[in-house]
Regions:
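Disulfide-bonded cysteine-rich modules in secreted/extracellular proteins
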Residues: 3-14, 104-106, 186-193
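Structural detector for internal amphipathic alpha-helices that build alpha-solenoid repeat scaffolds
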Residues: 10, 16-26, 37, 48-60, ...
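Short inter-helical turns and helix N-cap capping residues of alpha-solenoid HEAT/ARM repeat scaffolds
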Residues: 42-43, 113, 225, 294-295, ...
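Eukaryotic acidic, Ser/Thr-rich intrinsically disordered low-complexity regions
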Residues: 125-148, 316-344
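Intrinsically disordered, low-complexity terminal tails and inter-domain linkers enriched
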Residues: 141-185, 199, 286-289, 317
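Terminal, non-catalytic domain-edge segments
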Residues: 178-181, 185, 189, 339-344
Length: 344
């Protein structure tokens, strides 16, 4: 194996170690509470630990942490993690949680051209939510049915923030105080996960911008040997956007493969939508037409991916193709795609 190949494998294994460290915490409301408090506190090191560990959470847990993560929008040292973690949340579910939180924060900044406003606007544009930018400064945009959330302070300033009353902060989600031993175990797991993520980032640093690394990962993802696919996908979390974007066509091939889930979907969702869309959409439809062995569930998987990103027109295209497919099972799945994603 080449030196580049060995480095990719090492990065992938370190990311696996990071995920294994928090594996017992997945779906654990107490763990979400600890992460939320760390993100809400003044300790930047703890907050970074929480952000790094959050890459391995279930979607539900990550969604519960959105208000706490959003408190770090505009903090440059956390910017890359904030953008990518929020991108991993399906946009249909992210929108109603994130936008009011950002709007509440901006009510504290009178300057419409200030750095926080620019950071919030840039984040929404990256997520494909540019239609929501107006709501950030429009006091009437919340509507009359749902009041805006309480204004959070900056992380650690003691202001009333999401962690005071929302999932991800305060008491554990079930309302019961966890034992000190349980909380200590959670904190240890989070720190261990963050430790491995930092090691992975350090090991991946020489690979960033290296065309040989991108070419090798692309080659490994273009085969079905099963030897290096998971290492490649895990290592890709540590690549910069430009390198990850170059791998989109190769990653697309794995979207409907259960044994590597959820890595393909999450990697694609981490990218800025304006750059992702012109690469992703042709790759998806080319792959759907190319692979004659796709079953009906594969069609649903790709529709689900595009729905997660917010590409409704492309979901409609998949449904239309499925509805006219020669396979009756695929045609039936086309109807399910319409019912699941396009009814509202």
């Amino acid at each position: 194996m080449t030196a580049v190949g060995a480095a990719v494998v090492r990065v992938g294994r370190l990311v696996w170690e990071a995920g294994a460290a928090v594996g017992p915490l997945l779906g654990n409301g107490d763990a979400v509470g600890v992460l939320g408090r760390w993100l809400d506190g003044a300790d930047a090191g703890r907050a970074e630990d929480a952000l790094l560990a959050s890459y391995h959470l279930y979607d539900e847990d990550l969604l519960a942490l959105v208000p706490a993560i959003a408190r770090w929008v505009g903090v440059e040292s956390a910017a890359a993690h904030v953008r990518r973690l929020l991108g991993m949340v399906p946009v249909r579910r992210l929108r109603p949680v994130l936008v009011p939180v950002l709007a509440a924060r901006l009510r504290e900044e009178p300057d419409p051209d200030g750095p926080l406003h620019r950071a919030c606007t840039g984040l929404l544009e990256r997520l494909g939510l540019e239609d929501e930018v107006r709501r950030l400064t429009d006091p009437d945009s919340h509507g009359t049915r749902t009041p805006p959330p309480e204004t959070p302070g900056e992380p650690g300033d003691g202001g009333a923030g999401p962690a005071d009353g929302a999932p991800g902060g305060g008491e554990p989600a079930d309302g019961k105080a966890g034992s000190a031993d349980d909380e200590g175990a959670i904190e240890q797991a989070v720190r261990r996960s963050a430790h491995f993520m930092r090691r992975a980032a350090a090991a991946a640093a020489p690979l960033a911008g290296d065309p040989d690394a991108v070419a090798l990962i692309d080659e490994w993802l273009s085969t079905w040997s099963g030897e290096h696919d998971l290492d490649s996908l895990r290592a890709a979390y540590m690549l910069p956007d430009d390198d990850l974007l170059a791998l989109v066509p190769a990653i697309v091939r794995w979207v409907d493969v259960d044994r590597v889930a959820p890595h393909p979907r999450r990697l694609l969702c981490m990218l800025p939508i304006s750059r992702l869309r012109p690469v992703l959409v042709p790759a998806v439809f080319s792959w759907l037409r190319e692979d004659l062995e796709f079953d009906d569930l594969s069609w649903w998987s790709y529709a689900d991916l595009l729905d997660d990103i917010g590409l409704n027109d492309e979901v409609r295209r998949i449904a239309d193709l499925a509805l006219t497919h020669e396979d009756r099972l695929v045609r039936a799945m086309g109807k399910e795609i319409v019912e699941d994603f396009l009814q509202d």
